[in-house]
Design a protein with these regions (language model features):
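Residue-level recognition of hydrophobic positions within alpha-helical transmembrane segments
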Residues: 7, 20, 110, 173-176
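A structural signal for short, hydrophobic/glycine-enriched beta-strand patches
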Residues: 26-174
Length: 182
């Protein structure tokens, strides 16, 4: 009888844990949704920061800078093995911007280091308000990390949707990022 009660308790506890994890994952997904409907107005921020990673992040950041959403752009987390002219050559449309308004960070290798570099960049360039551009699924963790060093009211977020035709790739990225978020 006691073993049966222990077994029921074990099953109940396991079910409760699964429910809590699913509810928290749903909360994580809702946080991602909040970045989708951000309306960006001209001159809302002084600087734009792109955290490298998935496709489209850099091009989205360059497009925002071109639209005068901010005055300067930091591309953070650039692989140190990639020469910076390779990135410049990838986006010839933005040559003028590369010559005046764009800086690179190739020392950061994770989200915390990116945010630390953003903090230093803000100080060195006398920038108060920034827009951080990253993949939508990455932004909850970016926001969590940035709240340690950056003022909430001076930091805005812009989510770039990962455009994959395969739902399983999107789900894998969401689950991996959720685990990192925990």
């Amino acid at each position: 009888m006691i073993n049966e009660i222990k077994l029921h308790y074990y099953h109940f506890s396991l079910l409760l844990i699964v429910i809590i994890v699913l509810l928290h994952f749903n909360y994580f997904l809702l946080k991602i949704k909040k970045y989708e409907f951000l309306l960006i107005e001209e001159n809302i921020v002084e600087g734009i920061v792109v955290l490298t990673g998935d496709k489209y992040r850099i091009s989205e950041g360059l497009s925002l800078l071109e639209k005068k959403i901010g005055n300067k752009l930091l591309i953070s987390g650039v692989n140190s093995k990639i020469p910076l002219n390779v990135i410049k050559n990838e986006f010839p449309k933005y040559d003028e911007l590369f010559n005046c308004c764009i800086e690179f960070d190739n020392t950061s290798s994770n989200t915390f280091e990116n945010i630390r570099e953003v903090y230093v960049w803000k100080l060195n360039n006398d920038i108060n308000t920034i827009l951080i551009v990253s993949s939508d699924y990455h932004l909850p963790r970016v926001e969590l990390e940035s709240n340690r060093l950056l003022l909430k009211e001076e930091t805005h977020y812009y989510g770039v949707e990962y455009k994959s035709q395969k739902i399983n790739i999107r789900m894998k990225k969401l689950i991996v990022e959720y685990i990192k978020y925990l």
